[in-house]
Amino acid sequence: MENFPIINLENLCGAERDATMEMIKDACENWGFFELVNHGIPHEVMDTVEKFTKGHYKKCMEQRFKELVASKGLEAVQAEVTDLDWESTFFLRHLPVSNISEVPDLDDEYREVMRDFAKRLEKLAEELLDLLCENLGLEKGYLKKAFYGSKGPNFGTKVSNYPPCPKPDLIKGLRAHTDAGGIILLFQDDKVSGLQLLKDDQWIDVPPMRHSIVINLGDQLEVITNGKYKSVPHRVIAQTDGTRMSLASFYNPASDAVIYPAPALVERDAEENKQIYPKFVFDDYMKLYARLKFQAKEPRFEAMKAMEADVKIDPVATV
């Protein structure tokens, strides 16, 4: 079994830069996931985020989740549950307009901590997009421009806790899916595991590692790279012991961004691989995804092809 790709970003600054870029390229082409260490976000910042997130769950959300479980009779289920997930969540929006001040039940200090963390993640996401551009042979900034639309990217964090589950064989923490958006940055619990990705028809654990950031690619990067990079199905397995913390931050296109394969990549691959993905408005894709999240992505792309004739390409996103 191949080892899950773990990439030390500090190595981009020295003699190992070429080898590190090759590791990122291989991870994007063959895994759709990789794990970053020495990514520039201070450990003390991450420790503070973890402390406040776990404290907020205990104080404000744990009892609500127990009441929800009791109301649905989930502790006594005898057959597989396919229409819900064993997770307690809330969502913070950062861009284009933050909602952090409006989310109820957050301590003011937690709000400030998350604002700071989000700015650091945004910077890291944009650095990573430029590394992907370099590996793809696209001009620097191409992917950020492709996501920009009229108001800039959508960026937000799904804060999740996965409590102990009495029937993990029957209830998933989070059912298998690909992510709809662009690039996802995950700060996950380093003590309680559960995240798995599908590779070569096998479910593989994403190793919990202290102070790492797990990266995965969404459907939009698969489209823009014309399939050179793939979004990969992943899931969360519920555990009988321990509550797993997960902060998944989604750097996504603007709602009105027009997404389509990069012309330079289509031309380069023309002999063996014509343009196989549609062009569409990201918001249209998200409306479809909301209904079909836990189904295969290919029918979503096919549905977008049916709408393609009405989509105008925004010249800002061309090479």
UniProtKB/Swiss-Prot annotation:
Its cofactor is Fe cation. The keyword Metal-binding applies. Pfam families: 2OG-FeII_Oxy (PF03171), DIOX_N (PF14226). GO terms for molecular function: 1-aminocyclopropane-1-carboxylate oxidase activity; 2-oxoglutarate-dependent dioxygenase activity; L-ascorbic acid binding; metal ion binding. Fe cation binds at residues 177, 179, 234. Pathway: Alkene biosynthesis; ethylene biosynthesis via S-adenosyl-L-methionine; ethylene from S-adenosyl-L-methionine: step 2/2. GO terms for biological process: coumarin biosynthetic process; ethylene biosynthetic process; response to molecule of fungal origin. Its EC number is 1.14.17.4. It is an enzyme of class 1 (oxidoreductase). SUPFAM superfamilies: Clavaminate synthase-like. This is 1-aminocyclopropane-1-carboxylate oxidase 4. It comes from Petunia hybrida.
